[in-house]
Amino acid sequence: MATCADTLGPLLGTAAANATDYLCNQFADTTSAVDSTYLLFSAYLVFAMQLGFAMLCAGSVRAKNTMNIMLTNVLDAAAGALFYYLFGFAFAFGAPSNGFIGKHFFGLKQVPQVGFDYSFFLFQWAFAIAAAGITSGSIAERTQFVAYLIYSAFLTGFVYPVVSHWIWSADGWASASRTSGSLLFGSGVIDFAGSGVVHMVGGVAGLWGALIEGPRIGRFDHAGRSVALRGHSASLVVLGSFLLWFGWYGFNPGSFLTILKSYGPPGSIHGQWSAVGRTAVTTTLAGSTAALTTLFGKRLQTGHWNVIDVCNGLLGGFAAITAGCSVVDPWAAIICGFVSAWVLIGLNALAARLKFDDPLEAAQLHGGCGAWGVIFTALFARKEYVDQIFGQPGRPYGLFMGGGGRLLGAHIVVILVIAAWVSFTMAPLFLVLNKLGLLRISAEDEMAGMDQTRHGGFAYAYHDDDASGKPDRSVGGFMLKSAHGTQVAAEMGGHV
């Protein structure tokens, strides 16, 4: 591809050298400014997903644990910021490094003064706390607050960054952008925005947490039959799902990191800006297809049109397409979403049979659909898109697209390694916390609800068991509906 100087030099005649340098520097500054702004805006969108996680989690738990689950979401972001700053970013992107882990930039110390964009740190931190948020849903309603603090710091500061180093760092052993050493199976792993790096990590961690804690009291009866412990607000679940959908447009398209990159000669009007738009489309189609497939699949299974199931199916489709969103065609994204819905339905049925309790279906949704997304990418990645994004013609691409099986081999390896790494690190942590009595709350606290026993009161005023927020019935005001459903009436001057 011709450089700026090569293009402008012949056009400017005798003053070519000075004029070319000046104009090219101006273009470079403008390009850097636009790319940095694009990345920063994408980071804001990904961070807004924390609000979506908070609403989704709040609606999916019972009212008596609402304040607790909301506090854990705040904790994920706040503690995650400090631990990712101190340790996580260095383990993920500290250069120079080896293929396993980064070794520099602890506390952002000695980052390059030229060429380092702080927007990149913010963007990567937003991804790290997303992984921690996934895990919190799996262990909701029965976990001690101190356990949240410990696991969140460990996951954000160490476990997740190591995986992101493997796949997204230029030095990582599985990276498709590796600059030193040979690529895994000659291709590396194409996990563009994190079906494996983010969703599998969070899902597998949640799997171990939920397994070690055991199910919530009342989740299964004495005969072992599943008993639904429904969340208290479908409205919050829908709100959270839409906020997550919105944030995914920063999560997936934002993972290009830059937007002003041309894929052809000057004037071709074809570049990364086109790929960004296509990625948003594939993201939309996968999630939408998964939502509709889940709607009808669960209708056949249960006889109901369940909005909670549809929202979970939607998010499962997004989790699956995240790996290959940039390298597949829109029609392939529909296949991705369709299969991800059945993966989620099947894993939920298996979880009920095995008496596995995950209040938000996070292990099944993020772990299972994330793993499917990594496999899907190895099957449907298109040669043209792979060459454009990684800039090296002749790379392996999707098996079903004629690219052979090397990419699939690399992806199978990384799925197994991610599952093993998270299991090796997070399972012992949860076991130690459990052994020390720091993991699960007491049965009495669980029955009463953590909002009352651990957080000083209920999340909602006028909770049936909370008299502190109710007006005095002896004074003119409102007669409240009782716990037994008596009629609500207004007292105005003694007349009803």
UniProtKB/Swiss-Prot annotation:
It comes from the Eukaryota. InterPro entries: Ammonium/urea_transptr (IPR029020), Ammonium_transpt (IPR001905), Ammonium_transpt_CS (IPR018047), NH4_transpt_AmtB-like_dom (IPR024041). PROSITE patterns: AMMONIUM_TRANSP (PS01219). Its main location: membrane. NCBIfam families: amt. It is a multi-pass membrane protein. GO terms for cellular component: plasma membrane. Keywords: Ammonia transport, Membrane, Transmembrane, Transmembrane helix, Transport. Induction: By ammonium or glutamine supply in roots. This is Ammonium transporter 1 member 2. It is found in: Membrane. Ammonium transporter probably involved in ammonium uptake from the soil and ammonium uptake and retrieval in the vascular system. Belongs to the ammonia transporter channel (TC 1.A.11.2) family. GO terms for molecular function: ammonium channel activity. Signal peptide: none annotated. It comes from Oryza sativa subsp. japonica (Rice).
